[in-house]
Structure formats: structure tokens, C-alpha cells
């Protein structure tokens, strides 16, 4: 199972940076939440998640599409820490689903306080609401079982056994 965790830029799509993130006057902060998710996955016998630092690299749509086409990712986790990340989440999810409709897209961070909107207006499949480490591992376990089963459709009821997630059921109802 191929898993990628990405950072999400806070600027609106198309915003032109005046300089590279690494050229700013302040130090670059580590991505603590992403490191924690990866650490929890490793502790639970999942391989190291790939990390695509979209916030730092600030790639265009074609580069993002190429990355996900080349890496054939089964699960993508977004770390969306502020509300201004919404349009970027919408953009990134659209690009990823264009490459592979079956990729499971999980969004975490403060933005998921608006889980209902995210799930209805973007191509995100699951929102993690609150601390994400345990939920992230639960999602990975479920996805591993799903991929091994050979079934096309995720088992929503089984997935909802994972505490701390929100998703839309088959009737488009928001479930926690």
C-alpha cells in the first residue's frame, strides 16, 4: 500500500510567491503533525509514508499530477492547518482524483472543523476531526484490509468504527 502525506499551502491557488519558502527571513518550521502521523504509522507496522511538501515546493498543477501518477498512491493525507487552505485542498483533491479515482483522500487539521463543507464541496473522502494519530492508523488498517479484499467499494460501516473521522455515507448523509 502506497501512502503519501502532504502539506497544504495557505495561499489561494495561483498566488505567486515573491520568493521560495526557503529564502524567507524566518526559519522554516518543521511539519510536526505530519511527522507524528508518520511515526504512529511506523509504530503500527506500516511502511514509512512518503512526504510531499507541497507547501514548501509550491509545484504547479502539472507537477502535482505527475507526482501522483508516478507514485501510484493508494491513500493521501492532507495536513490543512488553517481555513485559508480550503481552496488548496479542493484543488489538490481534484488533481489527485483525476489521476486515480480510487485514491482515498483524508484531510486533517483545523480546517476539518468544516468537515460537512469539505466532504460535500471537494473530492476529499474522509475528514479526521481532532487529534489524528489513532484515527490515521485506523484508516490505514481499514484501507489495507480493503485493498487485500479485492472489493471495489469501501465498507463504510466498518470504516466508521474508526473514532474521530467524518465521511458521507452512500445516501450522502454526514456520519461521525
Q: Where are each of the predicted segments found?
A:
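Short catalytic helix/loop segments, enriched in acidic residues and glycine
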Residues: 21-41
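Short glycine-rich His-centered loop
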Residues: 2-28
